[in-house]
């Protein structure tokens, strides 16, 4: 099934004929298969591991270094993430480079005109399926300084670092704050700890600083989050392993504690698939007596999921908006 963006691209198949093609950005389907027959070659790059892991021909990472005669960028909902990815890629190609940018209007794709105008000619060439399609030709190669995109803030004795589109990138969010408040020195936490959906590394770094003896693993699907967590650990001289994983897809160990402020937004829609998988599979990933501890908006239907997977659960903290749930193996 094609995304709305790819449906618009199918109206312009002659543009892909006999050219090397790169698809990158928020690619979420197999439009590549639609153009392979007529294109010279097709490469796909994604910064999202949940998509990339499904297909052997999709490259995953933070920096896209793949060159192509025609690049197609799928706009994401985060303008700064788009700016980062577009300028990073354009900084390494030559004047005359062609690019198509496709995105949903509600995701703010119109702002690509202002973003890319300083670097070349951009024009809207189609509008359909509530999407806009733009053609861009590079005339002035941009300078890309990745350092300018970093944000940082102080959290007690920690320095937190984050790239665009990473959750809790500018300040500590209320849910994570409530979750962290449930840990104290008296817990004497030890053993293997997994911070799943680590974002900027706030939870994992806080626990590692408080409980030095834990063996910390942090995971996320987003390359920008993984890089953010690595830097947060490094800047605070903390040890930990950071891995790309779609829930438990790339994790084989068992843990004494799995802790998470799990995402329930997918792009600009709400989705629960990752959280459902987390709760359903967590018990099998815990050592005997191990604990799953998560924070969530109070309105979300997690109690039933926890009871189904674990048999019971406890609410160990709550506020007007959030609840912290604990379930033990």
UniProtKB/Swiss-Prot annotation:
Subcellular location: Cytoplasm
Catalysed reactions listed for this entry: guanosine(1207) in 16S rRNA + S-adenosyl-L-methionine = N(2)-methylguanosine(1207) in 16S rRNA + S-adenosyl-L-homocysteine + H(+)
Pfam families reported in the protein's UniProt record: MTS, MTS_N
Keyword Signal appears in the UniProt entry: no
E.C. number: 2.1.1.172
Keyword annotations: Cytoplasm, Methyltransferase, rRNA processing, S-adenosyl-L-methionine, Transferase
Gene Ontology CC annotations of this record: cytoplasm
SUPFAM superfamilies: S-adenosyl-L-methionine-dependent methyltransferases (SSF53335)
Molecular function per GO: 16S rRNA (guanine(1207)-N(2))-methyltransferase activity; nucleic acid binding
Primary location recorded for the protein, binned into one broad class: cytoplasm
Source organism, top-level taxon: Bacteria
HAMAP family: 16SrRNA_methyltr_C
PANTHER family per record: RIBOSOMAL RNA SMALL SUBUNIT METHYLTRANSFERASE C (PTHR47816:SF4)
Sequence similarity: Belongs to the methyltransferase superfamily. RsmC family.
Subunit structure: Monomer.
Role this protein plays: Specifically methylates the guanine in position 1207 of 16S rRNA in the 30S particle.
Protein name as it appears in the record: Ribosomal RNA small subunit methyltransferase C
Organism: Actinobacillus pleuropneumoniae serotype 7 (strain AP76)
Lineage: Bacteria, Pseudomonadati, Pseudomonadota, Gammaproteobacteria, Pasteurellales
Gene: rsmC
């Amino acid at each position: 099934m094609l995304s709305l963006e790819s449906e618009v691209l199918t109206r312009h198949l002659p543009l892909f004929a006999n050219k090397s093609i790169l698809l990158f950005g928020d690619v979420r389907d197999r439009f590549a298969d639609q153009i392979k027959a007529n294109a010279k070659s097709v490469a796909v790059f994604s910064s999202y591991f949940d998509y990339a892991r499904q297909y052997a021909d999709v490259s995953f990472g933070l920096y896209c270094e793949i060159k192509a005669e025609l690049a197609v960028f799928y706009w994401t909902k985060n303008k700064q993430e788009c700016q980062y990815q577009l300028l990073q890629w354009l900084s390494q190609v030559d004047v005359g480079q062609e690019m198509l940018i496709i995105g949903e209007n509600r995701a703010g794709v119109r702002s690509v005109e202002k973003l890319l105008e300083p670097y070349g000619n951009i024009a809207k060439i189609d509008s359909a399926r509530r999407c806009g399609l733009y053609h861009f030709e590079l005339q002035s190669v941009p300078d890309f300084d990745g350092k300018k995109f970093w944000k940082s803030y102080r959290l007690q004795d920690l320095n937190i670092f984050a790239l665009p589109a990473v959750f809790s990138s500018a300040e500590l969010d209320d849910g994570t704050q409530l979750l962290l408040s449930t840990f104290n020195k008296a817990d004497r936490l030890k053993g293997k700890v997994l911070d799943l959906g680590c974002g900027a590394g706030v939870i994992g770094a806080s626990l590692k600083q408080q409980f030095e003896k834990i063996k910390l693993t942090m995971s996320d699907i987003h390359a920008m989050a993984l890089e953010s967590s690595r830097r947060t650990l490094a800047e605070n001289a903390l040890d930990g392993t950071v891995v790309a994983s779609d829930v438990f897809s790339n994790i084989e160990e068992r843990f004494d504690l799995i802790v998470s402020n799990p995402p329930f937004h997918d792009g600009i829609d709400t989705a629960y698939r990752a959280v459902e998988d987390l709760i359903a599979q967590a018990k099998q990933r815990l050592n005997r007596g191990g604990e799953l501890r998560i924070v969530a908006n109070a309105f979300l239907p997690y109690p039933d999921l926890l009871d189904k997977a674990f048999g019971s659960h406890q609410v160990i903290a709550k506020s007007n908006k959030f609840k912290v749930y604990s379930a033990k193996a």
